[in-house]
C-alpha cells in the first residue's frame, strides 16, 4: 500500500496539498456564524444528490410531469423521502444564504480586498433564487403553472424588448411544453453548472485572501 502511495506522492505531491489544506490560520474571532456559507454549500450538495435521484423518475412533459411527481411520492422506493429532503434543503439553502449575506455585510467582509468575493456571492444569490423559480414549476400543477405564467410575464413591461424577452423565456407566445422544457433544462443543468463554477471561484478567493477580520 505504501508503494502505491509513494507512486502518487512522487507525481502529485499529495502531502504538500494536504498540509496546505490543514495549515490555514483561523482567526480567533471566528464563531458559528462564519459557518453559514459552508452550510449553504452542504445544502447545495444535498440538492444535487436528491435532484439527480429524482431525474430517474421525473418526466418533463406537460401531460406527465404531475403524474411522475405523484409516482415519486407514492410508489418509488423512498421517493417521498428524497423529494421531501430536496424541498427542505432548498428552503434551508435559501435561509442560510440570506443569513450568510447579512453576516458578511454586518462584519464588513465585502470591503477591500474582497470585492470580487462579494460579487461572486451576489451572483450565487441570484442563481439560488433562480433555482427556486425554476424548480417551483416542475410539478406542473396549478401553483407551478400560474407561477411560471406570472414570472415570465413580468418582463413584458420593459419597453421594446419586453415581448421578445417573454417569448424567449416561454419558448413560445404562451406557457406550455416549451416553457417546461426550458425551466427543466435550467434547473437541472444550466443553473447547477453555473453555481458550481461560481462557488469554486468564491471558495478559491476565500482560500487566497483568508477570512475577513472583525469590525
UniProtKB/Swiss-Prot annotation:
UniProt: heme c binding residues: 35
UniProt-annotated location(s): Plastid, Chloroplast thylakoid membrane
InterPro entries linked: Cyt_b/b6_N, Cyt_B6_PetB, Cytb/b6-like_sf, Cytochrome_b_N_euk/bac, Di-haem_cyt_TM
Highest taxon of source: Eukaryota
Name of a matching Pfam family: Cytochrome_B
Cofactor field: heme b; heme c
Major localization listed first in the record, in broad terms: plastid
Residues binding heme b 2, per UniProt: 86, 187
Mode of membrane association: Multi-pass membrane protein
Transmembrane segments: 32-52, 90-110, 116-136, 186-206
Keyword Electron transport on entry: yes
Cofactor binding remark: Binds 2 heme b groups non-covalently with two histidine residues as axial ligands. Binds one heme group covalently by a single cysteine link with no axial amino acid ligand. This heme was named heme ci.
BP term (GO), one: respiratory electron transport chain
Any one of the GO CC terms: chloroplast thylakoid membrane
GO molecular function, one term: electron transporter, transferring electrons within cytochrome b6/f complex of photosystem II activity
Keywords attached to this entry: Chloroplast, Electron transport, Heme, Iron, Membrane, Metal-binding, Photosynthesis, Plastid, Thylakoid, Transmembrane, Transmembrane helix, Transport
Amino acids binding heme b 1: 100, 202
PANTHER family reported in the protein's UniProt record: CYTOCHROME B
Function: Component of the cytochrome b6-f complex, which mediates electron transfer between photosystem II (PSII) and photosystem I (PSI), cyclic electron flow around PSI, and state transitions.
Further remarks about this protein from its record: Heme 1 (or BH or b566) is high-potential and absorbs at about 566 nm, and heme 2 (or BL or b562) is low-potential and absorbs at about 562 nm.
Subunit structure: The 4 large subunits of the cytochrome b6-f complex are cytochrome b6, subunit IV (17 kDa polypeptide, PetD), cytochrome f and the Rieske protein, while the 4 small subunits are PetG, PetL, PetM and PetN. The complex functions as a dimer.
Similarity remark: Belongs to the cytochrome b family. PetB subfamily.
Stated name of the protein: Cytochrome b6
Naturally occurring in which organism (per UniProt): Eucalyptus globulus subsp. globulus
Gene: petB
